[in-house]
A protein has these predicted regions:
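A short, structured active-site edge motif that brings together acidic residues
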Residues: 58-70, 97, 156-158
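Short acidic, glycine-rich surface-loop motifs adjacent to enzyme active sites
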Residues: 94-95, 100-102
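Short, acidic/polar
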Residues: 10-25, 73-90, 108-113, 137-142
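Conserved, mostly hydrophobic/aromatic
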Residues: 25, 33, 48, 61, ...
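N-terminal binding-site loop/beta-alpha segment at the start of enzyme catalytic domains
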Residues: 1-59, 92
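A short acidic, helix-capping loop that chelates divalent metal ions and anchors anionic groups
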Residues: 2-8, 68-72, 192
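Beta/alpha (TIM)-barrel catalytic core signal, keyed to glycine-rich beta->alpha loops juxtaposed to Asp/Glu
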Residues: 102-211
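Acidic (Asp/Glu)-rich catalytic clusters
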Residues: 26-27, 49-60, 83-92, 116-120, ...
Length: 211
């Protein structure tokens, strides 16, 4: 599972040849490429749009709809971001589209209805949820079931030996509704690799940089 947020900055910083990195990932058994509308202000998706046609091995790809762009996770956000993401990626469809974060202030029916329409148009195969609490996952599933809309089948969330909240309630919810769990941040931002000699050391780049 290859996430394209922080890795993009590394590739640019060290002038690494992008397509060789992706080929190495696929050659060594990787299959799933993960990006998002907001990653590096769209640069990640544009980079993938350049690289994907050069890859010689099969892959699957996922992107995400984020409420922070329009200020709401609604139908407008879904249509705008899905279509722009596909244009950046130079694809007609992707394997999975995640709702990146929940938006408790906006009724979720609007974005779910739009995602169902986009799914019917063939823009993606699977609906995913990312960073949603268990109760909202259950709510989303039942709304989709009631309307006959595409249901979520995969969840993406933080999980590592230091961040284990998923074990309390989330895992049972995912098992109950049949969602796969893709964990991000498995090495706690590099903390578990021994990269930082002291807990007081501050990262100079990556997810946990003070910005």
């Amino acid at each position: 599972y290859f996430m394209n947020n922080n890795i993009y900055r590394t590739l640019v910083k060290y002038e690494i040849i992008y397509d060789e990195v992706y080929e190495a990932f696929l050659k060594n058994g990787g299959e799933e490429l993960d990006t998002a509308y907001v990653y590096n202000e769209g640069s990640c998706e544009k980079l993938l749009g350049e690289v994907l046609p050069t890859l010689s091995r099969p892959y699957t790809i996922a992107t995400k709809v984020n409420p922070r762009i329009t200020g709401k996770l609604n139908a407008e956000a879904a249509y705008m971001q899905v279509n722009e993401s596909l244009a950046r990626l130079r694809l007609d469809s992707v394997d999975t589209i995640f709702l990146h974060f929940p938006d408790p202030a906006t009724p979720v029916e609007g974005v779910l209805g739009a995602m169902a329409d986009l799914h019917d148009q063939g823009k993606f195969k699977e609906l995913g949820l990312s960073n949603f609490p268990a109760w909202m996952i259950a709510d989303v599933w039942h709304i989709c079931d009631r309307h006959g809309w595409v249901k979520p089948t995969v969840f993406e969330g933080i999980y590592n030996p230091l961040t284990r909240k998923a074990e309390v309630e989330l895992n049972d919810c995912l098992n109950n509704f049949g969602l796969r769990f893709y964990a991000y941040n498995p090495m706690a931002g590099g903390l578990l690799t021994g990269k930082y000699a002291k807990y007081e050391d501050e990262p100079t780049d990556g997810r946990f940089t003070h910005r």
